[in-house]
């Protein structure tokens, strides 16, 4: 596949129409910021709901009405009666919320710079070109595309249009089973590690091939034709950082340590862990732990910090200690931005509203509905 012509058309950040934070808000002290957020929320009342992803910093989570993973928060958005949904997350999450909420509701992302790099690793132009190459390599086979929830609305729409669906980290294995009941081959996007871990779970570890959209030569037709699962070469920069050595080190430092990791981690890390699951699973695992147990957390550092605070009776440690990363995209949701968008709503002005194209939204909803039927 020749990708040379794509270079000027592709961007890892889908939303570039961001509004700069006014200087007044950049200079707010933490105390003044909190007071103004609380005052604006009091004035807006039930007209606004604030959602905070598990990976958000403490200053956002403390102002959130609901805290959870992206799918949990989208469901909370759909159930909310509020006119305004402020999403403390990243762009693909706000898109999903916009798709499933009522048309009368506005979904607001405090900072448009909160763009997930992994979601940006599978852009529509690349996927269209890859789909043409992959289907040409296996012309007599039915290929079912599956996209992880961590993707933009246009990719969700593409997968639905081609007969595929959306999945979460919790139901990826059921999505694969669904696809193989209807087709011969799966194209999984954008996270290769979740795809590989799911293939292992289904006993199909040797049936995969990795597709690098940036490699001009792509994969040979024979490699694609021989594989049952084509894995898009995308990944989470936070979770890819974890290594088996981190697991060994934490077990050496804590004799009775248990290790729980996210399935976006490398296969070798998943194999070395005691429990593997979504952020909801990680949260539940620590909540159910006996007092005095040690749990090493292999995911974004803010969730590990939240769990330490929420469950002081459990010894919660980051899997890679001080080297554990925060998510740079999540970090863009600064509490000063939250104060700004709230006070703008008080004045009747909506800032940074996420609006998915209606045709894309309709198709993406089909992919989400297929997931819900699993």
UniProtKB/Swiss-Prot annotation:
EC category: transferase
Pathway field: Cofactor biosynthesis; NAD(+) biosynthesis; quinolinate from iminoaspartate: step 1/1
Recorded GO CC terms: cytoplasm
Primary localisation category: cytoplasm
Catalytic activity, reaction form: iminosuccinate + dihydroxyacetone phosphate = quinolinate + phosphate + 2 H2O + H(+)
A Gene Ontology molecular function term of the record: 4 iron, 4 sulfur cluster binding
Subcellular location: Cytoplasm
Residues reported in the UniProt entry to bind [4Fe-4S] cluster: 116, 236, 327
Transmembrane spans: none
Keywords on record: 4Fe-4S, Cytoplasm, Iron, Iron-sulfur, Metal-binding, Pyridine nucleotide biosynthesis, Transferase
Record carries keyword Isomerase: no
Record family assignment: Belongs to the quinolinate synthase family. Type 3 subfamily.
Name of the protein in question: Quinolinate synthase
Organism of derivation: Halobacterium salinarum (strain ATCC 700922 / JCM 11081 / NRC-1)
């Amino acid at each position: 596949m020749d990708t040379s012509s794509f270079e000027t058309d592709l961007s890892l950040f889908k939303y570039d129409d961001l509004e700069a934070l006014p200087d007044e808000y950049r200079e707010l002290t933490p105390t003044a910021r909190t007071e103004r957020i609380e005052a604006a929320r009091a004035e807006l009342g039930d007209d606004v709901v604030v959602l905070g992803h598990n990976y958000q910093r403490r200053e956002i989570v403390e102002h959130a009405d609901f805290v959870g993973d992206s799918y949990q928060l989208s469901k909370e958005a759909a159930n909310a009666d509020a006119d305004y949904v402020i999403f403390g997350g990243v762009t693909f999450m706000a898109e999903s919320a916009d798709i499933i909420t009522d048309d009368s509701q506005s979904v607001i992302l405090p900072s448009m710079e909160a763009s997930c790099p992994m979601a940006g690793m599978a852009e529509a132009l690349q996927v269209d070109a890859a789909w043409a190459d992959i289907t040409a390599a296996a012309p007599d086979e039915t290929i079912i595309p599956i996209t992880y929830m961590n993707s933009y609305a246009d990719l969700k729409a593409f997968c639905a249009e081609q007969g595929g669906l959306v999945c979460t980290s919790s139901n990826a294995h059921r999505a694969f089973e669904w696809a193989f009941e209807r087709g011969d081959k799966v194209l999984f996007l954008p996270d290769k590690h979740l795809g590989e871990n799911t293939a292992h779970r289904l006993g199909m570890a040797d049936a995969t091939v990795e597709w690098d959209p940036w490699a001009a030569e792509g994969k040979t037709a024979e490699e694609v034709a021989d594989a049952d699962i084509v894995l898009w070469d995308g990944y989470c920069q936070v979770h890819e950082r974890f290594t088996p050595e981190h697991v060994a080190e934490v077990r050496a430092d804590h004799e009775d340590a248990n290790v729980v990791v996210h399935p976006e981690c490398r296969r070798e890390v998943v194999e070395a862990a005691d429990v593997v699951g979504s952020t909801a699973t990680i949260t539940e695992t620590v909540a159910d732990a006996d007092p005095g147990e040690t749990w090493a957390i292999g995911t974004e550092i803010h969730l590990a910090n939240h769990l330490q605070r929420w469950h002081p009776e459990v010894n919660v440690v980051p899997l890679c200690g001080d080297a554990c990363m925060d998510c740079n995209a999540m970090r863009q949701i600064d509490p000063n931005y939250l104060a700004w968008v709230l006070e703008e709503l008080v004045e009747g002005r909506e800032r940074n509203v996420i609006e998915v194209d209606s045709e894309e939204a309709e198709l993406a909803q089909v992919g989400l509905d297929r997931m819900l039927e699993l």
